[in-house]
Swiss-Prot record:
<dbReference type="GO" id="GO:0035999">
    <property type="term" value="P:tetrahydrofolate interconversion"/>
</dbReference>
<dbReference type="InterPro" id="IPR000672">
    <property type="entry name" value="THF_DH/CycHdrlase"/>
</dbReference>
<keyword id="KW-0521">NADP</keyword>
<feature type="binding site">
    <location>
        <position position="191"/>
    </location>
    <ligand>
        <name>NADP(+)</name>
    </ligand>
</feature>
<keyword id="KW-0378">Hydrolase</keyword>
<dbReference type="GO" id="GO:0009086">
    <property type="term" value="P:methionine biosynthetic process"/>
</dbReference>
<keyword id="KW-0511">Multifunctional enzyme</keyword>
<keyword id="KW-0658">Purine biosynthesis</keyword>
<keyword id="KW-0486">Methionine biosynthesis</keyword>
<dbReference type="InterPro" id="IPR020867">
    <property type="entry name" value="THF_DH/CycHdrlase_CS"/>
</dbReference>
<dbReference type="InterPro" id="IPR020631">
    <property type="entry name" value="THF_DH/CycHdrlase_NAD-bd_dom"/>
</dbReference>
<dbReference type="GO" id="GO:0000105">
    <property type="term" value="P:L-histidine biosynthetic process"/>
</dbReference>
<keyword id="KW-0554">One-carbon metabolism</keyword>
<feature type="binding site">
    <location>
        <begin position="166"/>
        <end position="168"/>
    </location>
    <ligand>
        <name>NADP(+)</name>
    </ligand>
</feature>
<keyword id="KW-0028">Amino-acid biosynthesis</keyword>
<feature type="binding site">
    <location>
        <position position="232"/>
    </location>
    <ligand>
        <name>NADP(+)</name>
    </ligand>
</feature>
<comment type="pathway">
    <text>One-carbon metabolism; tetrahydrofolate interconversion.</text>
</comment>
Amino acid sequence: MTASIIDGKVIAADLRARVAFEVARVKRDHGLTPGLAVVLVGSDPASEVYVRSKHKQTQAAGMASFEHVLPADVAQPDLLALVARLNADPAVHGILVQLPLPKGLDTETIVAAIDPAKDVDGLHPHNAGRLAGGLPALSPCTPLGCIILTKSVHSSLEGMDAIVIGRSNLVGRPLVQLLLNENATVTIAHSRSRNLPELCRRADLVYAAVGKAEMVRGDWLKPGATVIDVGITRRPAADGKTRLIGDVAFDEAMEVAGAVTPVPGGVGQMTVACLLVNTLRAACAIKGLPAPGV
């Protein structure tokens, strides 16, 4: 068996196009231009690249993009004051503070200061609590992207056995809640789980999100399983550059699984696309409009 590759580039491009269509519609029908504000603290190169990508894709979708770059030594009260101004700005419907923050800044305090209605990262305790309760909420972008990728293979996840390897607040825990909302049967595993390979072999859906390169081997997988690889590890290559490696041994998985996301070109492509989805949804909710068709 050779698995099919779940092409995150193609699926993300389609999602961005649908977002752009809906943005044009709400502009035309309601005079609403969704706006996303991104706050970058410091000059981490990886974060700078990610923020530039967000800015470019936000504008391409027809949304307003607002960038705020602060020095790494910014005082926490000053950062909180910026968040308060963005909360009050009617042109801003989504606020994202790029993580991780430099030392000396309390991430929980900053995230909790964001208006939950504008929390397009889905990390505010209000949104996390609603998601855990099975209520409508802005969901973290990477887990949301994982669900969309999975549903490109399976129209319904109802009754399927899923395993999520990783229990972070950013990916693992919210992904479990989204899978439960799809009526999947979910096991959450982590670094202290016993018999992890055996647990994986039972699963129709495998989500690897631990950040340990090639941890999930081919013989861990149930034949025909769908494998969503969230992990990213940078490994030195022979040419002196670095290459990205996922949490799944890709070549081995391709011989056993039914469908696999590559790294790069899989989940990462979906994260910014889902950020646009959340911004559009937030804008419509804030303005009291019906939920958009994405």
